[in-house]
Design a protein with these regions (language model features):
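Specific transmembrane alpha-helical segments of multi-pass solute transporters/efflux pumps
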Residues: 12, 16-17, 45-96, 132-133, ...
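C-terminal transmembrane-helix exit sites in multi-pass transporters
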Residues: 46-55, 100-125, 250-270
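Hydrophobic/small/kink-forming positions within alpha-helical transmembrane segments
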Residues: 14, 18, 45, 69-74, ...
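Helix-helix packing/entry segments at the starts of transmembrane helices
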Residues: 35, 73, 92-98, 165-189, ...
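Glycine-/small-residue-enriched transmembrane alpha-helix faces in small-molecule transporters
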Residues: 1-33, 82, 142-169, 190-191
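Transmembrane alpha-helical segments that form core, pore/gating elements
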Residues: 44, 103-105, 109, 141-199, ...
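Hydrophobic/aromatic residues within transmembrane alpha-helices
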Residues: 23, 32, 36, 83, ...
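Hydrophobic transmembrane alpha-helices of multi-pass small-molecule transport proteins
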Residues: 44, 66, 106, 119-138, ...
Length: 284
């Protein structure tokens, strides 16, 4: 059952990049992110209420939510959505798979109990070679939109890595769904007024495919995905759950190719193999 849930989670998160690619064709980035965070927050509030849980009132916890909601929600969601205006959804899902590699590097310098080993060093090198292969065409062309889009996705991975490290100590002892709700709430607080002030999306009229993709991204890719994610953690372990990292880019690449006719070039496939090998090594 846990394996089935893990496969479903990988499929859902892999499809998120497809939905984002469809949405950014018509919807401003900040509006996309603000709408996603707002609807997801309201849905998780409802889940908390029906389950008898509630958000904490501790100022210390809300300071943590404020930091993690910015670095782990508002910023990476915006970077991913902005980046996908210029690169394929499959490439975005693949570059996002570098998160565990960044986590290993940051953990070595920011924690006392996670030291880097030779296997992890090799994994980091292999993973970054994979990233370099993917970004080489853009580097040859200079700082164009394609390269900046790739850098935005890599930046979001760095944000997620930092969030994972600090969340362990700052949110220790908190029920996972409560923590997720707190972070989403603060992400909404940041992005909703920002969107209203900058995008002014008052007369926005998205097409039906874009609206459907936005709803699926929010409900399926955020709310349902979080519920499944924390269910797996409760039933098995965090280590088992992190195996989803291997599933997401494969699904993302396949969906991009099948739905949007994105090309699976030898460069992309080579980068996929090296990044996943790097992730495997840093987890040994």
């Amino acid at each position: 059952m846990n394996l089935l849930l893990l496969l479903i989670l990988g499929a859902i998160w892999g499809s998120s990049y497809l939905f984002i690619k469809i949405i950014v064709a018509e919807m401003p980035v900040l509006t996309l992110v603000a709408g996603r965070l707002t609807l997801a927050t309201l849905a998780l509030w409802l889940i908390l209420r029906t389950s008898g849980s509630s958000l904490p009132r501790s100022r210390r916890m809300w300071r943590a939510y404020a930091a993690l909601g910015f670095v782990g929600m508002a910023v990476p969601y915006t970077l991913i959505s902005w980046g996908e205006q210029y690169i394929s959804s499959g490439l975005a899902s693949l570059l996002q798979a570098t998160t565990p590699i960044f986590t290993v590097i940051l953990a070595h310098f920011l924690t006392d109990d996670e030291r880097i080993t030779m296997a992890k060093i090799v994994g980091v090198i292999v993973g970054f070679v994979g990233v370099g292969i993917l970004m080489l065409p853009g580097l040859r062309q200079g700082l164009r939109a394609n390269l900046l889009g790739q850098l935005a996705i890599v930046g979001s991975s760095l944000c997620y890595a930092g969030t994972a490290i600090y969340a362990r100590s700052w949110l220790r002892g908190q029920p996972p769904l409560v923590s997720a709700s707190g972070q989403l709430t603060m992400g909404m607080v940041y992005m909703l007024p920002t969107s209203l002030l900058i995008d002014r999306p008052f007369n926005l009229s998205p097409s039906l495919p874009v609206l459907a993709s936005w709803l699926l991204l929010t409900i399926l890719g955020t709310v349902v995905a979080y519920v499944i994610y924390f269910t797996i953690i409760e039933r098995s372990s965090a280590t088992f759950t992190t195996m989803v990292t291997y599933i997401i880019p494969v699904n993302g690449l396949m969906l991009g190719a099948l739905v949007l006719n994105e090309q699976l070039t030898p460069t992309v496939l080579g980068g996929l193999v090296l990044i996943l090998l790097g992730v495997l090594l840093v987890r040994t």
